[in-house]
C-alpha cells in the first residue's frame, strides 16, 4: 500500500499546497482524498480542486462537504448531515490504492480534529498503517504544536514520516530560522521541505517551486 496521510499542526499552515507539491512530483498515478471539506459551499472549488489546479492530472476525491468553516464533526452536526467516519475514509483510501501508485489523504485542521463523535485523522492512519507527514508553520509557537502532533502519533504507533514547513516567509525572523534546526529535534522526524509563502500563486511555476522546496525523499532537491 502506498498511502501517505497529510496533517497539519493547525489550520492555514499550508497542507493543501504541500499535498499539491507532493502530487506534482510523484511519478505514476496519484489520487488525492479529502475526507471532509468544510467552509466551502456547494459548487465552489475545494481543496482537491486546488491540488488539481497546481499539480495537474490527479484523481481528486472528496467524501463530504459542509458549508461552515468548523471542525468536520461540528460542521456535520450543524448542517444536519451525516459525519464522515474514519472507517469510511480508510476504505476509500484502500479502494484508490488499488488503481494508483500513490494516495494522499489530506486531513482537516490538525491530527486530532474530530470527524465524528470520536474518530480523528489519527484513527484513519492507524486503520491504514500509513505514515503521516506533518505540515507546520515556520514561526514562533510551531515547536510545541509539532512536538505534540509527533507525540500523539507515537502514542498510537503511527510513523511520523517527516515535517514540511508549508508557508515560509520571504523575510524569516530569528524564530523561523532557528525552527528549521529545532523542528527535527522536537519531533524526532526529518525536515522534508520548506515551501515559500505564495507558492500557489502561479500554477505554471508550481512544479519548479515544489522541486526546489521538497527534499529528495518527496521527489525534490531541497536540503538544509
Curated annotation (Swiss-Prot):
Residues of the active site: 34
Binding site residues for ATP: 12-17, 47, 106-109, 166-167, 196-198
Binding residue positions for Mg(2+): 16, 47, 106
Protein's GO biological process: biotin biosynthetic process
Enzyme class, spelled out: ligase
InterPro entries in the cross-refs: DTB_synth_BioD, P-loop_NTPase
GO molecular function annotation: ATP binding; dethiobiotin synthase activity; magnesium ion binding
This enzyme's EC code(s): 6.3.3.3
Task performed by this protein: Catalyzes a mechanistically unusual reaction, the ATP-dependent insertion of CO2 between the N7 and N8 nitrogen atoms of 7,8-diaminopelargonic acid (DAPA, also called 7,8-diammoniononanoate) to form a ureido ring.
Similarity comment: Belongs to the dethiobiotin synthetase family.
Designated name of the protein: ATP-dependent dethiobiotin synthetase BioD
Organism encoding this protein: Saccharopolyspora erythraea (strain ATCC 11635 / DSM 40517 / JCM 4748 / NBRC 13426 / NCIMB 8594 / NRRL 2338)
Amino acid at each position: 500500500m502506498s498511502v501517505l496521510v497529510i496533517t497539519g499542526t493547525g489550520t492555514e499552515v499550508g497542507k493543501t499546497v504541500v499535498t499539491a507539491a507532493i502530487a506534482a512530483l510523484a511519478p505514476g498515478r496519484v489520487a488525492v482524498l479529502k475526507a471532509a471539506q468544510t467552509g466551502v459551499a456547494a459548487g465552489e472549488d475545494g481543496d482537491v480542486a486546488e491540488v488539481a489546479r497546481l499539480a495537474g492530472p490527479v484523481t481528486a476525491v472528496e467524501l463530504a462537504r459542509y458549508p461552515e468553516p468548523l471542525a468536520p464533526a461540528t460542521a456535520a452536526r450543524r448542517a444536519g448531515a451525516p459525519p464522515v467516519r474514519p472507517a469510511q475514509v480508510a476504505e476509500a483510501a484502500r479502494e484508490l490504492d488499488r488503481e494508483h501508485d500513490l494516495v494522499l489523504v489530506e486531513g482537516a485542521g490538525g491530527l486530532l480534529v474530530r470527524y465524528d463523535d470520536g474518530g480523528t485523522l489519527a484513527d484513519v492512519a492507524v486503520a491504514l498503517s500509513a505514515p503521516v507527514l506533518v505540515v507546520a508553520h515556520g514561526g514562533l509557537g510551531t515547536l510545541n504544536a509539532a512536538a505534540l502532533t509527533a507525540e500523539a502519533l507515537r502514542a498510537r504507533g503511527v510513523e511520523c514520516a517527516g515535517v514540511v514547513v508549508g508557508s515560509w516567509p520571504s523575510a524569516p525572523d530569528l524564530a523561523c530560522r532557528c525552527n528549521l534546526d529545532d523542528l527535527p529535534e522536537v519531533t524526532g522526524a526529518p525536515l522534508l521541505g520548506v515551501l515559500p509563502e505564495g507558492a500557489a500563486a502561479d500554477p505554471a511555476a508550481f512544479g519548479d517551486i515544489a522541486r526546489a522546496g521538497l527534499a529528495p525523499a518527496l521527489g525534490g532537491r531541497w536540503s538544509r
